[in-house]
């Protein structure tokens, strides 16, 4: 029997999807039998995060967490970070920012949650550097000595950007002047900024921008020469002629970066409350497998988007991505992501954000170190 589902803020779309021939509930339940000898079965479990396409089968009930009745609660990353690190910690399973989690562990001895190697959000970040078109900035090296705006400083996305700017182009954090905006034009999507995203290290020049201006307006008004931001600034999305991307063909730049480094930057991971894991040692594997099954279902959906989707070249894009990055281009598990994880941990320590350089094994629950994607 399929376990009961409750839905918070996310509508179920099972009916329309099932008519298109996607993998059925029966197929997934057969792969993950719900028979469980643990006396606590079925465990009431709340999972929080964003309703990404590759998570949606877990949300709408097509995929089950073995041994659990699962509630999915939609949340914004800043709010989820705050809840996990310094809030009521009611969530048993939550999406979190990878860098904030690492900083809480390294700097605050945080140990209430552990990570499992599921990564709901990952993005190449060359596309996330924006410039004022009139400042003569033509290449990354031109950012030396410039004023760069950011909303916050120590988020995962900004750590990645500073990392590849230093290692790929020789532009170190201390080579520029940082201006932190008092507002963020993308706050409605990201939520409140957690403490771990506002760490300011020693040895850099940093100041607060004009009161009442978000990062987008600072760039438009010329208060800064460039902008590092996880989201597209408002002025860019509105087509302001003076706001451009530093990398005009960011797709080609990011593809080349992956081919050379093998790094596909991770933004978010999944954390589980340790007291719950201690009481139910089988739970990390059940949660991991559910996320993995959901992702596999999305791969199947994507294989048919050339006919069912609206984008005219989706099929070609999907095939090209697989050719460059492999069939499982969004892998879960430690070993498939070790190089990427270690790069971020290195950047955080180099940039003076983390007080100590952490290993992968320190952040992820010991039982999950050998987990690999289901196929």
Where do the model's predicted regions map?
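N-terminal export signals
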Residues: 6-28
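Secondary-structure end/capping motifs
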Residues: 271, 276-350
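A glycine-rich, aromatic-flanked flexible loop/lid motif
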Residues: 16, 257-268, 312-320
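C-terminal segment of N-terminal export signals and the immediately downstream linker at the start
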Residues: 1, 22-48
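Short, glycine-/small- and polar/acidic-enriched structural segments
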Residues: 38-40, 44-187
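Short helix-initiation/N-cap motifs at beta->coil->alpha
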Residues: 73-84, 176-217, 362-369
């Amino acid at each position: 029997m399929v376990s009961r589902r409750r839905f918070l803020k996310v509508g179920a779309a099972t009916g329309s999807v099932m008519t298109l021939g996607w993998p059925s509930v029966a197929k997934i339940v057969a792969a993950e039998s719900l028979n469980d000898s643990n006396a606590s079965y079925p465990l009431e479990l709340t999972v929080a995060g964003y309703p990404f396409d590759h998570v949606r089968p877990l949300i709408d009930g097509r995929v089950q967490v073995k041994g659990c009745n699962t509630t999915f609660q939609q949340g914004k990353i800043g709010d989820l970070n705050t809840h996990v690190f310094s809030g009521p910690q009611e969530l048993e399973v939550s999406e979190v920012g990878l860098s904030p989690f690492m900083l809480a562990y390294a700097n605050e001895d945080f140990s209430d949650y552990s990570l499992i190697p599921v990564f709901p959000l990952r993005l190449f970040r060359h596309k996330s550097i924006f410039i004022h078109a009139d400042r003569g900035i033509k290449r990354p090296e031109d950012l030396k000595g410039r004023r760069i705006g950011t909303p916050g400083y120590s988020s995962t996305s900004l750590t990645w950007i500073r990392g590849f700017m230093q290692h790929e182009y020789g532009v170190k954090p201390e080579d520029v002047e940082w201006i932190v905006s008092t507002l963020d034009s993308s706050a409605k999507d990201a939520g409140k900024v957690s403490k771990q995203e506002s760490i300011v290290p020693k040895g850099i020049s940093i100041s607060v921008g004009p009161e009442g201006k978000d990062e987008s307006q600072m760039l438009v008004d010329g208060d800064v020469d460039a902008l590092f931001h996880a989201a597209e600034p408002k002025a860019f999305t509105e087509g302001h002629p003076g706001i451009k991307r530093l990398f005009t063909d960011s797709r080609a730049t990011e593809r080349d970066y992956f081919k050379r480094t093998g790094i596909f930057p991770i933004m978010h991971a999944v954390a589980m409350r340790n007291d719950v894991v201690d009481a139910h040692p089988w739970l990390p594997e059940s949660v991991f497998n559910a996320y993995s099954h959901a992702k596999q279902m999305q791969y199947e959906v994507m294989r048919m988007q050339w006919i069912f989707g609206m984008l005219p070249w989706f099929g070609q894009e999907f095939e090209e991505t697989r050719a460059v990055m492999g069939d499982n281009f969004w892998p879960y598990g430690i070993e498939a992501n070790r190089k990427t994880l270690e790069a971020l941990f290195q950047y955080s320590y180099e940039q003076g954000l983390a007080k100590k350089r952490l290993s992968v094994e320190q952040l992820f629950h010991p039982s999950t170190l050998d987990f690999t994607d289901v196929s």
